């Protein structure tokens, strides 16, 4: 009996998935990711929240890169109920951010030029230095994929491959940094005004994630309203909400009437509320800028939701 699963074009494997420029970048991601993970796990070592985050980031990116390469090479992605172009663009951007963060954190917390005062200390140092180098190369490999797949002017592309789509991933990532600072001794519950800021961060984060999920799942066509128009309206509202938080949060955290204008001298490093409040303030302005840029780009994009 003949097979009912004949692949399009008569070929079961797609060699371009590993030989094209994007495919080459993905193969480098696998090589650098496996090398970085192995160097740290074998002898480099890690510990604490920072080390666990780095290992989790590298492991997550490596696992999904294997999935992407395998699906493209075997053409199985055509069987998945999602928009493959949106999925790969969103993952590449997220992996770039995760690997960039890990490439900064691991050398900062674990790498030293001098040898540790322990047996085989110089070997541990060398492994950590090598892991730091490959972590940087891993970030560059993911950044290269983002650059290669990003939609160009006049090009028909999926939403997540546009500047606006990529910015959605960055906005959600920055919001996660804000949430991390909020739960770390930020004292946001002292005033209703700062609680409003937390509500703003949460609402915008959930809406941004919803936009990404709808795009990746390919469900943007059944919303009853043009998806690009909904995105523009939401982005405009997010700019207004973040603008309010950008004014309210610094006032209620750093004005002498409500908080501390400067870092208290008795504030312990690693558990200082003022530090967390400063991180929230900085990344509030970062996300405000990202939403403004997103709004500007959203006026000009045209995308195909099913790619």
Curated annotation (Swiss-Prot):
Residues 17-154, 159-303 form the MARVEL domain. Keywords: Membrane, Repeat, Transmembrane, Transmembrane helix. It is a multi-pass membrane protein. It is found in: Membrane. Its main location: membrane. It comes from the Eukaryota. The keyword Transmembrane helix applies. The chain crosses the membrane at residues 53-73, 90-110, 129-149, 163-183, 198-218, 232-252, 278-298. One of its GO terms (cellular component) is cytoplasm. InterPro entries: Marvel (IPR008253), MYADM-like (IPR047123). The keyword Transmembrane helix applies. Belongs to the MAL family. This is Myeloid-associated differentiation marker-like protein 2. It comes from Mus musculus.
């Amino acid at each position: 009996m003949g097979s009912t699963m004949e692949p399009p074009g008569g070929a079961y494997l797609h060699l371009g998935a590993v030989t094209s420029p994007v495919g080459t970048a993905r193969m480098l991601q696998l090589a650098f990711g496996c090398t970085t993970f192995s160097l740290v796990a074998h002898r480099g070592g890690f510990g604490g929240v920072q080390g666990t985050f780095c290992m989790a980031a590298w492991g997550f990116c490596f696992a999904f890169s294997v999935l992407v390469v395998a699906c493209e090479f075997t053409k199985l992605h055509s069987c998945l109920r999602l928009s493959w172009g949106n999925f790969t663009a969103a993952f590449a951007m997220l992996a770039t951010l995760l690997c960039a963060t890990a490439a900064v954190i691991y050398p900062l917390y674990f790498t030293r030029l001098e040898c540790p005062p322990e047996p085989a200390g110089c070997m541990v140092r060398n492994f950590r230095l090598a892991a730091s180098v490959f972590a940087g190369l891993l970030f560059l490999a993911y950044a290269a994929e983002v650059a290669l797949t990003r939609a160009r002017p006049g090009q028909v592309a999926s939403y997540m491959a546009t500047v606006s789509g990529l910015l959605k991933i960055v906005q959600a990532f920055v919001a996660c940094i804000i949430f991390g600072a909020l739960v770390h001794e930020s004292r946001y519950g002292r005033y209703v005004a700062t609680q409003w800021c937390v509500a703003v961060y949460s609402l915008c984060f959930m809406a941004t994630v919803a936009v990404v999920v709808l795009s990746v799942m390919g469900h943007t066509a059944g919303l009853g309203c043009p998806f690009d128009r909904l995105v523009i309206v939401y982005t405009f509202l997010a700019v207004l909400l973040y603008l309010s938080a950008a004014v309210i949060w610094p006032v209620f955290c750093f004005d002498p009437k409500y908080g501390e204008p400067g870092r208290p001298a008795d504030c312990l490093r690693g558990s200082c509320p003022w530090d967390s409040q400063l991180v929230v303030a900085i990344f509030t302005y970062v996300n405000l800028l990202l939403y403004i840029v997103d709004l500007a780009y959203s006026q000009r994009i045209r995308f195909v939701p099913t790619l």
